[in-house]
UniProtKB/Swiss-Prot annotation:
<dbReference type="GO" id="GO:0005886">
    <property type="term" value="C:plasma membrane"/>
</dbReference>
<dbReference type="GO" id="GO:0050380">
    <property type="term" value="F:undecaprenyl-diphosphatase activity"/>
</dbReference>
<feature type="transmembrane region" description="Helical">
    <location>
        <begin position="87"/>
        <end position="107"/>
    </location>
</feature>
<feature type="transmembrane region" description="Helical">
    <location>
        <begin position="193"/>
        <end position="213"/>
    </location>
</feature>
<keyword id="KW-0812">Transmembrane</keyword>
<dbReference type="Pfam" id="PF02673">
    <property type="entry name" value="BacA"/>
</dbReference>
<protein>
    <recommendedName>
        <fullName>Undecaprenyl-diphosphatase</fullName>
        <ecNumber>3.6.1.27</ecNumber>
    </recommendedName>
</protein>
<feature type="transmembrane region" description="Helical">
    <location>
        <begin position="147"/>
        <end position="167"/>
    </location>
</feature>
<dbReference type="InterPro" id="IPR003824">
    <property type="entry name" value="UppP"/>
</dbReference>
<comment type="similarity">
    <text>Belongs to the UppP family.</text>
</comment>
<dbReference type="GO" id="GO:0071555">
    <property type="term" value="P:cell wall organization"/>
</dbReference>
<feature type="transmembrane region" description="Helical">
    <location>
        <begin position="250"/>
        <end position="270"/>
    </location>
</feature>
<keyword id="KW-0133">Cell shape</keyword>
<keyword id="KW-1133">Transmembrane helix</keyword>
<keyword id="KW-0472">Membrane</keyword>
<keyword id="KW-0378">Hydrolase</keyword>
<dbReference type="GO" id="GO:0009252">
    <property type="term" value="P:peptidoglycan biosynthetic process"/>
</dbReference>
Amino acid sequence: MDLFNAAILALIQGITEFLPISSSGHLILTPYLLGWQDQGLVFDIAANSGSLAAVMLYFRREVGQMLRGGWRLLCAPRAWRQANAESHLVLQLALATIPVGLVGLACKDWVATVARDPMIIATTSILFGLLLWWADRQGRCNNDGSALSWRQVGIIGIAQAFALIPGTSRSGVTMTAGLMLGLTREAAARFSFLMAIPVGILAALLDLKDLFAHPMQGDELYFLGVGFCVSGLSAYMVIHGLLAWLKRQTMTPFVVYRVVLGVVIFATLG
């Protein structure tokens, strides 16, 4: 991998991580279509860590609330039954993370091999894109997300598990579930982004053993630094831009992009 490849892949990761168009699908397809060598797990970890840092920085106020809420749950025996707003957010995100954690552990090998097929990416891109369009058009989205029920959180968490299939899009499928449950576009996106924090931390912890097992040299550390910084900066800008966009616009451009991408993959590789 050279510097140009590293910067392009990190830029793709940062842009697509929080747009409802699937970062994993794009990171698989880009080297495949351009004939590049696989970027490797360590680079993926660096780029994903950059995106994680971006969402934590953007929602630093909520991250502070989560830290205080988590500390309260650990230190106060009755906090589990009488959770304040901060503790409630921690419990909500924990519940939403359980399904993807369990499914990820059970299907890790399948996701890392069979599910990376471009035909699967094309299918999920179109299918879940159309579901996003339907959810966005149903017209009942008036919940600002301030009073999500445990049932709603559980449903969004189950939806997130489908994002393990490349091409589905974690942000896309969780926003779709949120819209189906009546959340506004902005509220669905905000909760989806907050859900990315525990999922990203969990994924990073699971990848630590692979990171430590891989001996790194000076040049490789430089590429990893580029991947982290480019991914983080672009992801931060996308989060800000998408939340502003969804205050007044629909999901239609992302749906069109997903369908066109799927059709192009089928036409090119089918």
